[in-house]
From Swiss-Prot:
Known role: Cell wall formation.
Source organism, top-level taxon: Bacteria
Disulfide bond annotation, renumbered to this chain: none
Reaction(s) catalysed (UniProt annotation): UDP-N-acetyl-alpha-D-muramate + L-alanine + ATP = UDP-N-acetyl-alpha-D-muramoyl-L-alanine + ADP + phosphate + H(+)
Binding sites annotated in the UniProt record for ATP: 110-116
Biological process according to GO: cell division; cell wall organization; peptidoglycan biosynthetic process; regulation of cell shape
Protein name per its UniProtKB record: UDP-N-acetylmuramate--L-alanine ligase
Pfam families, alphabetized: Mur_ligase, Mur_ligase_C, Mur_ligase_M
Localization (cell): Cytoplasm
GO cellular component, one term: cytoplasm
The species this protein was found in: Lactococcus lactis subsp. cremoris (strain MG1363)
Pathway named in the protein's UniProt entry: Cell wall biogenesis; peptidoglycan biosynthesis
EC number: 6.3.2.8
PANTHER family: UDP-N-ACETYLMURAMATE--L-ALANINE LIGASE, UDP-N-ACETYLMURAMATE--L-ALANINE LIGASE-RELATED
Length: 443
């Protein structure tokens, strides 16, 4: 009888991608989660993967049980039932560590840019050579016969330590997740441990001082804009249509590349993809062709229009990510008002980076803040509020509530950049409904 894989917490971005991969490989897959809508479930529904509410009746001793990293005995009935009955299970990252052993695997690690870079690398490689992939926006493709496996490698709680890929990209090292990491030295130590796992090659951003500190058995290739980088981007042109650059490997030009994406960070993401593909011996003309057709990943500078109003949805929830997202918006819309609508994610992160959040939000013309979205792992001790953060921002800033987003209407030709990792999309949906109603009333 064919084994059934049950995913507890299947709507998680990594979990849903892994479930889709196994489903496409012909495995029996099902999963459970809360009944709240999450953007990853659309792909699961389209694939016909059964989605169930959490219930101990979902767990059978013959199932292979894969559990999201956030779930424990005290917050999930399925885990409590499995423990009580002695049913074995693997955490997501433990299962993935074993899964990748059947492929030549390429991880993408970094405090920021993992999902976008994983998506870009997966898009390019899968159009050139048979490649399975797992992207942190909930997208996955699985083929047991694939030569390569591209996946997102997460540093939080050192979840990437079971991974021993042949290659990895490291986009940057930055202090985040203050509920777990003690500081930048702790984060750097985690990346050093991960670097020790890599078998054949590391591709690291050369202008990151902490990445420059790493040592490894595998060769380290640095990429960036400086003369001492192994892979270097030159002749960079950024316009309202995207970005283009020439790529060099140790002084030798390897190609000209155009990326229909915005922001300096996306040029670096593309350069890291070029570096990996060049090292693997893939044809650079093919790489250039498929970079040109990359359309991004879910919730990373995702654009839509409601009438003439531009709305951008982005997962940015760290100061570095907000800065990059607003830079991208400025590149594409240099003559329009940039309106940032930001929901801080977790109280610990908001406390740790309050001044940094205020500084980067000042890159927008006007700022709106949603109430802080607390993590299930923490308690609100009322040490900080969204209004406290608004008071630190120098540009015009105010707090809005989900039941009244009408202040957002006060901007003609505004480009609205909704950012956050919580439920900021609910504010976006409320604003879209308000725009539609306003438009109808004017007709």
């Amino acid at each position: 009888m064919e084994k059934t894989y049950h995913f507890t917490g299947i709507k998680g971005s990594g979990m849903s991608a892994l479930a889709l991969m196994l489903h496409q490989m012909g495995k029996n897959v099902q999963g459970s989660d809360s009944t709240d809508y999450f953007f990853t479930q659309r792909g699961l529904e389209q694939a016909g993967v059964p989605l169930l509410p959490f219930d101990e009746k979902n767990i059978k001793p013959e199932f292979e049980l894969i559990v999201g990293n956030a779930f424990r005995d005290d917050n999930n009935v399925e885990i409590a039932f499995a423990h009580k009955n002695g049913f074995p299970f693997k955490r997501y990252h433990e299962f993935l560590g074993h899964f990748m052993e059947d492929f030549t695997s390429i991880g993408v690690a970094g405090a920021h840019g993992k999902t976008s870079t994983t998506g870009m690398l997966a898009h390019v490689m899968s159009n050139i050579v048979d490649t399975s992939y797992l992207i942190g926006d909930g997208t996955g493709r699985g083929n047991a016969g694939s030569e390569y496996f591209v996946f997102e490698s997460d540093e939080y709680e050192r979840h990437f330590m079971p991974y021993h890929p042949e290659y990895t990209i490291m986009t940057n090292i930055d202090f985040d997740h203050p509920d777990y990491f003690e500081g930048i030295e702790d984060v750097t130590s985690a990346f050093q441990d991960y670097a020790n796992n890599i078998k054949k090659g590391i591709f690291a951003y050369g202008e990151d001082v902490n990445l420059r500190k790493l040592s490894a058995k595998a060769p380290i290739y640095y990429y960036g804009f400086e003369a001492n980088d192994d892979y270097r981007a030159e002749n960079l042109i950024r316009s309202t249509r995207g970005s283009s650059f020439d790529a060099y490997f140790r002084g030798e030009k390897i190609g000209h590349f155009v990326v229909p994406a915005y922001g300096k960070h996306n040029v670096l993401n593309a350069l890291s993809v070029v570096a990996v593909c060049h090292n693997l011996g893939l044809d650079m003309t093919d790489v250039a062709d498929h970079l040109l057709t990359f359309r991004g990943v879910k919730r990373r500078f995702t654009e839509k229009k409601v009438g003439e109003t531009v709305i951008i949805d982005d997962f940015a929830h760290h100061p570095t990510e907000i800065e990059a997202t607003l830079d991208a918006a400025r590149q594409k819309y240099p003559d329009r008002e940039i309106v940032a609508v930001f929901q801080p994610h977790t109280f610990t992160r908001t406390i740790a980076f309050a001044d940094e959040f205020a500084e980067v939000l000042d890159h927008a013309d006007t700022v709106y803040l949603a109430q802080i979205y607390g993590s299930a792992r923490e308690v609100d001790h009322h040490e900080i509020t969204a209004q406290d953060l608004a008071d630190k921002v120098r540009k015009p800033a105010k707090v809005i509530e989900l039941d009244n987003v009408s202040p957002l209407l006060d901007h003609d030709r505004g480009v609205y950049v909704f950012m956050g990792a919580g439920n900021i999309q609910k504010y976006e949906i409320a604003f879209e409904k308000l725009l539609s109603q306003t438009s109808t009333n004017l007709q």
